[in-house]
């Protein structure tokens, strides 16, 4: 089946997919900053493939020249496991962030200090019922959002919504589709989290004493 999505957008075989990208107009101040990779629990029916999927995303993030040092899943959990109070705070922070979109500042400041990362990068994958104009009764929303820990500001986000076809709900197709769409979100993030040429041109017009060069920040 061919479905045309009106916002975002793509003409694709299968379910209807829309991608939205938003972020701050100037991303240069956030280039090459240390990042803590935050993840949620496995969505329904993806428990078996979720650890591998998270691992693949983490590897891709560590390859991005625009990101600084990435504190990954295992390293993060080692720090949290050694500090039960911090782990409880992390769970509260993550729950608030995923349910409301709000970065709770007091908890974020503690996590920023312990994880030594001024930026948080959250992979959020939600499965929920779809009731209007859907090929089936299931839709996914996948977000990869970069947040400044201290301010709680959203720096950059890629959001993909996919309404599943009935034939995409078999176990094999389900797992394969989850990996494919998550990779798509990461690809969109990598292609969008950049500094446009005109921003570099503006930077090069500054006095040499305050100018930032690409080579100085590793991109």
Spell out what each predicted region is:
Residues 3-12:
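Bacterial N-terminal signal peptides
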Residues 16-33, 110-115, 134-219:
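C-terminal/domain-edge helix-coil "capping" segments
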Residues 21-22, 105-108, 129:
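Short structured motifs
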Residues 31-43:
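Short beta-strand segments enriched in small/hydrophobic residues
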Residues 46, 130-135:
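Extracytoplasmic/secreted cell-surface and envelope-processing proteins
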Residues 124-129, 161:
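Generic short beta-strand segments
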């Amino acid at each position: 089946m061919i479905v045309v999505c009106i916002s975002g957008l793509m003409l694709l075989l299968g379910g209807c997919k829309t991608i939205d990208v938003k972020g701050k107009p100037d991303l240069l101040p956030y280039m090459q900053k240390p990042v803590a990779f935050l993840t949620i629990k496995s969505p329904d029916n993806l428990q078996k493939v979720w650890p591998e999927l998270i691992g693949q995303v983490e590897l891709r993030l560590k390859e991005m020249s625009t990101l600084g040092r990435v504190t990954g899943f295992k390293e993060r959990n080692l720090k949290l496991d050694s500090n039960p109070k911090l782990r409880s705070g992390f769970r509260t922070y993550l729950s608030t962030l995923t349910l409301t979109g709000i970065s709770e500042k007091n908890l974020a400041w503690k996590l920023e200090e312990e994880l030594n990362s001024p930026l948080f990068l959250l992979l959020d994958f939600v499965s929920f019922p779809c009731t209007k104009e859907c090929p089936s009764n299931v839709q996914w929303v996948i977000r990869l959002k970069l947040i400044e820990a201290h301010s709680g500001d959203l720096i950059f986000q890629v959001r993909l919504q996919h309404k599943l076809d009935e034939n995409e709900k078999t176990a094999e197709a389900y797992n394969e589709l989850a990996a494919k769409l998550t990779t798509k979100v990461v690809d969109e993030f990598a292609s969008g989290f950049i500094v446009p040429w005109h921003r570099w041109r503006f930077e090069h017009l500054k006095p040499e004493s305050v100018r930032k060069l690409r080579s100085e920040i590793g991109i």
